[in-house]
Amino acid sequence: MALTAGIVGLPNVGKSTLFNAITQAGAESANYPFCTIDPNVGIVEVPDQRLIKLTDLVQPKKTVPTTFEFTDIAGIVKGASKGEGLGNKFLSHIREVDAICQVVRCFADDNITHVSGKVDPISDIETINLELILADLESVEKRIGRVGKMAKQKDKEAMAELEILEMLKAAFEEEKPARTVEFTEEQAKLAKSLHLLTIKPVLYVANVGEDEISDAENNEYVKRVKEFAANENAEVIVICAKIEEEIAELEGEEKEMFLQELGIEESGLDQLIRAAYHLLGLATYFTAGVQEVRAWTFVQGMKAPQCAGIIHSDFERGFIRAETVSFDDLVASGNMVAAKEAGKVRLEGKEYIVKDGDIIHFRFNV
């Protein structure tokens, strides 16, 4: 279950530098707009200390982490919704991702040009948000034209959809994104099926200078971004893309020492994945055996058969039981045999809601 997050931002805010750092994919990064014309896609392993601990306990032949997919989408500029700055192509790429990571420039540097001539993170955020809203407004207006005809004929489904479309249109005309509209559960499902840009969850990535990362909380730009995000119920993480490039070249103890010297508790990659997980309501379960220990990503609230289906559709179709133990219980027991003897291993049925950190062996028959 690979996740996809689109990294967006105005030109020269540091998004391609960040992408290079976290994926080590080498996307071209230069001091001019549109150095990323085609989307660069990179798949990174999701760091998880629990997977390392499980590997130590089980000693499998192979360990497989879960992954996260990042797409570096070229710099959006004012007028993108009307095709400015290769806008239409970029917007279509955003439609394909699960979440949007918007990199916001929170550093001053005369050597790096800003597309609007000054550093103003809120203006940058609003510029991108408005372009996405305008693109969604156009889509909704077209949809209203088609659905409205059926609604006039008293088609119940069309009438229900039209109500949602009108709610969205009203929000867009007030320059509010779709994710701020309050829907019922049924309306929310229908709204999601419209594949609107502004219904996707957003994570703001405040990119600060190298000399500010250890005291980023006092950065005035960062404070403004956090205030803005709070009104949207959006998440914010603070990184320094240039430092992330350096961290990407280090491993193990060398990496830990470098982070300590900078006064940083975790790398930007770890922050980004943790925040994206929270944003998308995701969690991890594990399968563990002598052949392989593997991490699997699932959506919180999924039941055991659905999680089994992530491995293979046959597992879901022929689901019988899920032999389950929590990560903490397994570690405390020392191994699976001891966990079973201690009564920590449970047999769960079709209605069991899988929890983050569960270690599961699925029983199935097809």
Predicted regions mapped to residue ranges:
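Conserved G1/Walker A P-loop phosphate-binding module
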Residues: M1-D109, E141, V147
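C-terminal-of-GTPase-core extension/linker across diverse P-loop GTPases
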Residues: L3-V8, V13, F19, R146-I353, ...
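Short capping/connector residues at structural and topological boundaries
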Residues: G6, F34, P39-G42, Q49-L51, ...
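Short, intrinsically disordered, mixed-charge
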Residues: Q24, D56, S92, E96, ...
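Glycine-rich, flexible loop/turn motifs
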Residues: A25-P33, N40-G42, R50-K53, K82, ...
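Amphipathic alpha-helical transducer elements in NTP-driven molecular machines
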Residues: F34, D48-L51, V64-F70, E84-V97, ...
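Conserved Switch II/interswitch segment of TRAFAC-class P-loop GTPases
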Residues: G42-P47, A74-E84, R95-A158, A171-T184, ...
